[in-house]
């Protein structure tokens, strides 16, 4: 495998910028694409992402562009870091410019809006069956990754050699450890469900329920994640790894998590719209909650925590009433 592999990162938000910074530091020719020319011009002028990562300058050789055709054709590996609700749209825009050797990965954590389908199914609908696909997932906050603090993630792919290639691209012995995992479905699912549970953890803390309640919610949330995974053929061990337990604990316990902060605001009595506006960035868990609800219903899987969060967000249920509904469920074996 060549030491250097060109890669284009599609999505110049906080996480896309952090991944591009890490890849460029690793010595790989890296191009960061953003959809808004004015924003990209600002990034180029400042040579940092002032909005999200103001203390981390871009490496000198990190290139930027708002030209999607240039980004797609500049590298054989594309890494999508875009919100889940525009994932299919971006793939459709990318498709006309694909190279014969293109491989596509994503760091997006979520499901298809209005259907709850896995992003792999969206990608196959748009791109067909031949292009190698991969997903990276795990406990990563953009600020810490960009700052070079120790971080570990997992990568899964439809093609083992592509998983190995991404591991080579991302892995940095000083700070960034990358595990490969054969469970393509499990890695996608873990990233979506943990966003929902993180909102629940924030709600619990916002209501003042304390550490006992938060820990119980995380633990039973993991059970719901495993239950849905089993229905979709995922490996239960995946949910005890980086993309499951790791990401779940991170986003449920640290206030860098937008989903947790969103839940905290709701628990403090703020309306959904107000809480979203205060975050000021995409809260993936809001949409993920509806998507997981749809997927669980389609699979016939019981997910009581996710269901109560859905009712709070989309049906106006009082958060305290949702907590009571969970605690008053019939007794059962663990």
From Swiss-Prot:
<dbReference type="GO" id="GO:0005829">
    <property type="term" value="C:cytosol"/>
</dbReference>
<dbReference type="Pfam" id="PF01210">
    <property type="entry name" value="NAD_Gly3P_dh_N"/>
</dbReference>
<feature type="binding site">
    <location>
        <position position="142"/>
    </location>
    <ligand>
        <name>NADPH</name>
    </ligand>
</feature>
<dbReference type="GO" id="GO:0005975">
    <property type="term" value="P:carbohydrate metabolic process"/>
</dbReference>
<dbReference type="InterPro" id="IPR008927">
    <property type="entry name" value="6-PGluconate_DH-like_C_sf"/>
</dbReference>
<feature type="binding site">
    <location>
        <position position="109"/>
    </location>
    <ligand>
        <name>sn-glycerol 3-phosphate</name>
    </ligand>
</feature>
<keyword id="KW-0443">Lipid metabolism</keyword>
<keyword id="KW-0521">NADP</keyword>
<feature type="binding site">
    <location>
        <position position="247"/>
    </location>
    <ligand>
        <name>sn-glycerol 3-phosphate</name>
    </ligand>
</feature>
<keyword id="KW-0963">Cytoplasm</keyword>
<comment type="function">
    <text>Catalyzes the reduction of the glycolytic intermediate dihydroxyacetone phosphate (DHAP) to sn-glycerol 3-phosphate (G3P), the key precursor for phospholipid synthesis.</text>
</comment>
<feature type="binding site">
    <location>
        <position position="284"/>
    </location>
    <ligand>
        <name>NADPH</name>
    </ligand>
</feature>
<dbReference type="GO" id="GO:0046474">
    <property type="term" value="P:glycerophospholipid biosynthetic process"/>
</dbReference>
<dbReference type="GO" id="GO:0046167">
    <property type="term" value="P:glycerol-3-phosphate biosynthetic process"/>
</dbReference>
<keyword id="KW-1208">Phospholipid metabolism</keyword>
<comment type="similarity">
    <text>Belongs to the NAD-dependent glycerol-3-phosphate dehydrogenase family.</text>
</comment>
<feature type="active site" description="Proton acceptor">
    <location>
        <position position="194"/>
    </location>
</feature>
<feature type="binding site">
    <location>
        <position position="257"/>
    </location>
    <ligand>
        <name>sn-glycerol 3-phosphate</name>
    </ligand>
</feature>
<dbReference type="GO" id="GO:0047952">
    <property type="term" value="F:glycerol-3-phosphate dehydrogenase [NAD(P)+] activity"/>
</dbReference>
<comment type="pathway">
    <text>Membrane lipid metabolism; glycerophospholipid metabolism.</text>
</comment>
<feature type="binding site">
    <location>
        <position position="194"/>
    </location>
    <ligand>
        <name>sn-glycerol 3-phosphate</name>
    </ligand>
</feature>
<feature type="binding site">
    <location>
        <position position="282"/>
    </location>
    <ligand>
        <name>NADPH</name>
    </ligand>
</feature>
<feature type="binding site">
    <location>
        <position position="138"/>
    </location>
    <ligand>
        <name>sn-glycerol 3-phosphate</name>
    </ligand>
</feature>
<feature type="binding site">
    <location>
        <position position="14"/>
    </location>
    <ligand>
        <name>NADPH</name>
    </ligand>
</feature>
<feature type="binding site">
    <location>
        <position position="258"/>
    </location>
    <ligand>
        <name>NADPH</name>
    </ligand>
</feature>
<dbReference type="InterPro" id="IPR006168">
    <property type="entry name" value="G3P_DH_NAD-dep"/>
</dbReference>
<keyword id="KW-0444">Lipid biosynthesis</keyword>
<feature type="binding site">
    <location>
        <position position="35"/>
    </location>
    <ligand>
        <name>NADPH</name>
    </ligand>
</feature>
<dbReference type="Pfam" id="PF07479">
    <property type="entry name" value="NAD_Gly3P_dh_C"/>
</dbReference>
<dbReference type="InterPro" id="IPR011128">
    <property type="entry name" value="G3P_DH_NAD-dep_N"/>
</dbReference>
<feature type="binding site">
    <location>
        <position position="109"/>
    </location>
    <ligand>
        <name>NADPH</name>
    </ligand>
</feature>
<keyword id="KW-0560">Oxidoreductase</keyword>
<feature type="binding site">
    <location>
        <position position="259"/>
    </location>
    <ligand>
        <name>sn-glycerol 3-phosphate</name>
    </ligand>
</feature>
<dbReference type="InterPro" id="IPR013328">
    <property type="entry name" value="6PGD_dom2"/>
</dbReference>
<keyword id="KW-0594">Phospholipid biosynthesis</keyword>
<feature type="binding site">
    <location>
        <position position="258"/>
    </location>
    <ligand>
        <name>sn-glycerol 3-phosphate</name>
    </ligand>
</feature>
<keyword id="KW-0547">Nucleotide-binding</keyword>
<dbReference type="GO" id="GO:0046168">
    <property type="term" value="P:glycerol-3-phosphate catabolic process"/>
</dbReference>
<dbReference type="InterPro" id="IPR006109">
    <property type="entry name" value="G3P_DH_NAD-dep_C"/>
</dbReference>
<feature type="binding site">
    <location>
        <position position="140"/>
    </location>
    <ligand>
        <name>sn-glycerol 3-phosphate</name>
    </ligand>
</feature>
<dbReference type="GO" id="GO:0051287">
    <property type="term" value="F:NAD binding"/>
</dbReference>
<feature type="binding site">
    <location>
        <position position="15"/>
    </location>
    <ligand>
        <name>NADPH</name>
    </ligand>
</feature>
